[in-house]
Amino acid sequence: MQRRQDAPLRCCVILLLVISAVIGCNRRRAATPPIQPVPTSVPLLPEVAILFSNGYAAMAADLRAALPRTAYKVTSVDVDVDESRRIIPTLRQKSKLVVVAIGLPAARVARDRFNGPVIFSQVFNYQELLVSGRSIRGVSAMPPLDLQVKEWKKLDPKIQRIGLIVAEPHSELIAQAEKAGKASSVAVIHEISSSDRETLYLFKRMTPQIDGLWLVPDDQILSPAVLRDLLSYARSHGVRVCVFNDALLEWGALMSATPTSADTTRTVRRLLEGLSNGATTAPNMTTVSELVIRLNVDVAGHFGLPSPTRAAWVVRSVR
């Protein structure tokens, strides 16, 4: 009888022991520290400073838009604005910064204030920027000469002799122009100048020998006053002039040949990607592969040239 009375008690004791064991097991599990995730390092994006001077804000904006935010950390600096320049000391402290400079004033700031790699564009007189021992590379401000003369010949089939006047530091352009002219059956008559007034004198002296003139964007041997006199004299003496700036069309030039902003941007980006990947074999100067031809229709009519179907068109090199 006693055993029957103790049976419920034993059942309760066993149940309590089971519950205690389960609770204890859960406590031991809770006490086990959680597995910590293995930290992963986030790679730092290459830092780029885009320096630009007056007149190149749009090109700087185009370049910034062309650099993916997922690939580069970009800072833009207008070197002509004091408030914008204040960030330069901070940028100088970044050891792996790459500077892209647009225009000569910006390129000079990049050369003088930074020690790292520099890529410049929109600079014709670039020789002063190529500091020995520095990684400084540029994108040529002159579009391919062979493309220029081919388009000129299409527009003006009768052109046979083109004049070219350059300063001594750009004498290498003479051989390039002669090669480009030969491919289109055009002779190049060349002179070396040391000043703007000498350029005008040399041009007037060569006028009887030429029917076209190739102007290069060299402010060492050209000035606004000389450009006006030269273009006026050219028109009155039957010389068609190809210029480097669209604004000079209004002064009487026949046509302008300029690099496209899009191609210059692509070329700068390609050089930048090479630097970011450790490339060290790029040449000091890289030539663009695309140019835009703009025509002064009134001047074309004055010289009796065939009526063009368009006043502007883009030409690309075949690589």
Give, region by region, the residue ranges found by the protein language model.
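Bacterial N-terminal signal peptides that target proteins for export
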Residues: 2-12
